[in-house]
């Protein structure tokens, strides 16, 4: 795998607030290489979620360019952006959003099937990930039969199921108690490092942020290395 992960070049974004434009991002720059985990910190309302949406090709910036696995996304149409996102991106949210009627392994198999992976190969990949997350014995359980920490670990496996080049996570342990959050985060770091993914993780937890390779802070619409 080459070192291309995620690059944000001079990202700008403003929103209408009455008659005025509220500038949330004023030229944010960031580069994350394969195998690197970067913490994104800053107060609520600073623009972290907006930055993640733009990095994940869910929202277009007003200016600047997003490079995903070395591919510039700005000039692409929506169909091409969706294809690029499905091919190279994994997402983890604060709430797991698992399908309640599916078992843990089925939740991890599904995105692979959508991507055209044969079912047998998809199940093999799902069991590999669940095993690395210490969930092999819980693979046939539905989300309602799992603890909060187990549910979030399944969500992490699902995000990495298609071997993305970039992982984006928005407060992935924010809905868990401190002890559970610590354990889930340990598993997340180990799995991401083992996969060689470039990861950007938004968190309000300074202890978790300090365990990542780098910390960048949203400050007045810019990204500042801490």
UniProtKB/Swiss-Prot annotation:
EC number: 7.6.2.-
Classification via SUPFAM superfamilies: P-loop containing nucleoside triphosphate hydrolases
Topological relation to the membrane, as annotated: Peripheral membrane protein
Keyword Disulfide bond (UniProt): no
One matching Pfam family: ABC_tran
Annotated positions binding ATP: 42-49
UniProt keyword Coiled coil, yes or no: no
Residues in ABC transporter domain copies: 6-226
GO CC annotations on file: plasma membrane
CDD domains noted in UniProt: ABC_MJ0796_LolCDE_FtsE
Gene Ontology biological-process annotations: lipoprotein localization to outer membrane; protein localization to outer membrane
GO MF term set: ATP binding; ATP hydrolysis activity; transmembrane transporter activity
Described function: Part of the ABC transporter complex LolCDE involved in the translocation of mature outer membrane-directed lipoproteins, from the inner membrane to the periplasmic chaperone, LolA. Responsible for the formation of the LolA-lipoprotein complex in an ATP-dependent manner.
Quaternary context: The complex is composed of two ATP-binding proteins (LolD) and two transmembrane proteins (LolC and LolE).
Protein's name according to its UniProt entry: Lipoprotein-releasing system ATP-binding protein LolD
Gene that encodes it: lolD
């Amino acid at each position: 795998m080459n070192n291309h992960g995620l690059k944000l070049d001079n990202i700008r974004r403003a929103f209408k607030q009455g008659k005025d434009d509220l500038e949330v991002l004023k030229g944010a720059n960031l580069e994350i290489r394969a195998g690197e985990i970067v913490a994104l910190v800053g107060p609520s309302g600073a623009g972290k979620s907006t930055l993640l949406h733009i990095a994940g090709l869910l929202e277009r910036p007003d200016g600047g360019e997003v490079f995903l696995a070395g591919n510039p996304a700005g000039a692409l149409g929506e169909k091409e952006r969706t294809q690029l996102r499905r091919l190279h991106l994994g997402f983890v949210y604060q709430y797991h959003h698992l399908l309640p009627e599916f078992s843990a392994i089925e939740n991890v198999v599904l995105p692979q099937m959508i991507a055209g992976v044969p079912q047998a190969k998809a199940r093999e990949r799902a069991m590999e990930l669940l095993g690395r997350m210490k969930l092999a014995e819980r693979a046939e359980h539905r989300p309602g039969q799992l603890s909060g920490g187990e549910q979030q670990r399944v969500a992490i496996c699902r995000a990495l199921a298609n071997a993305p080049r970039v992982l984006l996570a928005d407060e992935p342990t924010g809905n868990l108690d401190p002890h559970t959050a610590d354990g889930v985060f340990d598993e997340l770091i180990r799995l991401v490092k083992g996969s060689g993914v470039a990861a950007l993780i938004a968190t309000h937890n300074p202890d978790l942020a300090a365990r990542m390779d780098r910390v960048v802070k949203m400050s007045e619409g810019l990204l500042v290395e801490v």
